[in-house]
């Protein structure tokens, strides 16, 4: 899950790069992210809701991805606890990614209910156009950078304790 998140963070870095070259254009998705969003958009058009299917697909893709990452962060946290590894990063990753996941639950729900995503990354539905695009591109790049860094530091702490190889658990 952490490797998946590192890849996701790189995608947000590519989005920032695209934005730097084309700040007035619609945010760009990598081809694999666009394929995922389009695939989910197909199913989203079958469900009732207010938002465009493509918008709902993109939000749902982020919700699924952030749920997978949260599960990985929880695994790091549980391994740290079981192995008695003191890692504020494992705890911090759960808190930070938990809040990030809540943001995506709210964004997805509000897109389905009202057609407009409501959350900190959308300035609570108040911005639109390039103002919104700029904020969202940078918001997600920064938030994902922080979440990824905290999770990697927590994972390294758990690895160094031997919990990933079972050494620290076997000695209990």
What is the meaning of each model-derived region?
Residues 73-87:
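Juxtamembrane helix-break-helix junctions at the cytosolic face
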Residues 164-172:
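Short, highly charged, low-complexity non-transmembrane loops/tails of multi-pass membrane proteins
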Residues 103-164:
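Alpha-helical transmembrane segments of multi-pass integral membrane proteins
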Residues 53-72, 132-149:
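Membrane-interface loop-to-helix entry segments
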Residues 21-57, 120-136:
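Extracytosolic (periplasmic/ER-lumenal) interhelical loops and adjacent juxtamembrane/interface segments
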């Amino acid at each position: 899950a952490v490797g998946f998140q590192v890849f996701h963070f790189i995608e947000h870095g590519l989005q920032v790069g695209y934005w730097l070259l084309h700040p007035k254009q619609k945010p760009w998705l990598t081809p694999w992210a666009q394929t995922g969003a389009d695939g989910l958009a197909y199913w989203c058009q079958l469900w009732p809701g207010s938002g465009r299917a493509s918008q709902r697909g993109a939000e749902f893709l982020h919700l699924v991805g952030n749920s997978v990452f949260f599960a990985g962060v929880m695994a790091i946290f549980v391994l740290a606890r079981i192995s008695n590894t003191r890692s504020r990063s494992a705890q911090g990753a759960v808190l930070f990614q938990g809040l990030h996941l809540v943001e995506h639950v709210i964004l997805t729900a509000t897109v389905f209910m009202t057609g407009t995503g409501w959350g900190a990354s959308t300035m609570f539905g108040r911005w639109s156009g390039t103002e919104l695009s700029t904020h969202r591109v940078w918001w997600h790049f920064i938030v994902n950078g922080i979440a990824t860094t905290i999770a990697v530091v927590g994972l390294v702490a758990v690895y160094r304790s031997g919990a990933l190889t079972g050494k620290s658990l076997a000695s209990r």
